[in-house]
């Protein structure tokens, strides 16, 4: 139940943290508004083009962050007898589900600001976040559900390696 969910959460937060570190090093700031400002001047200034390794690591981690298939085994219907639905009662379970919905929107906006140049108006915000949201949806339709140990192994291998590459890429290619 919860222990497996925490293991999976930790495993996808590692590559995302590496990607964020790469972006912070690249733009020499941790301020989201300054990172967005540094990406202005055309779409070729977006992090997706200036540091594709960071975006790849973050996007692979984002697949797990959303909690959709194929990384939804913790909250999957067949996990109800041993999952959070039985470990929490009504008020705590509802808070957890509301928390997941709010964080999903916040992660979409954060991802858009860090890697896709931010948004200048509401239409651009909705269009970019919708496009980012569709990536995990399409992956969830295309791939079968992973077991927790499979997803932990996946996140700690490929996306983490790409995240480390992103930091080296920024340090030795972008900043030179």
Residue map of PLM features:
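Alpha-helical transmembrane segments of multi-pass membrane proteins predominantly involved
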Residues: 1-176
């Amino acid at each position: 139940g919860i222990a497996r969910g925490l293991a999976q959460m930790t495993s996808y937060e590692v590559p995302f943290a590496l990607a964020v570190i790469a972006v912070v090093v690249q733009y020499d700031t941790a301020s989201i508004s300054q990172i967005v400002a540094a990406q202005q001047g055309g779409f070729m200034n977006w992090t997706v083009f200036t540091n594709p390794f960071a975006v790849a690591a973050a996007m692979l981690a984002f697949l797990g962050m959303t909690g959709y298939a194929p990384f939804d085994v913790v909250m999957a219907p067949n996990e109800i007898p041993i999952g959070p639905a039985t470990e929490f009662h009504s008020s705590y379970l509802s808070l957890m589900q509301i928390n997941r919905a709010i964080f999903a929107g916040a992660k979409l906006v954060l991802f858009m600001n860090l890697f896709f140049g931010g948004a200048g108006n509401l239409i651009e915000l909705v269009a970019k976040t919708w496009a980012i949201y569709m990536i995990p949806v399409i992956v969830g339709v295309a791939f079968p559900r992973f077991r927790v140990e499979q997803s932990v192994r996946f996140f700690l291998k490929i996306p983490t390696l790409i995240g480390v590459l992103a930091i080296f890429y920024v340090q030795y290619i972008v900043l030179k």
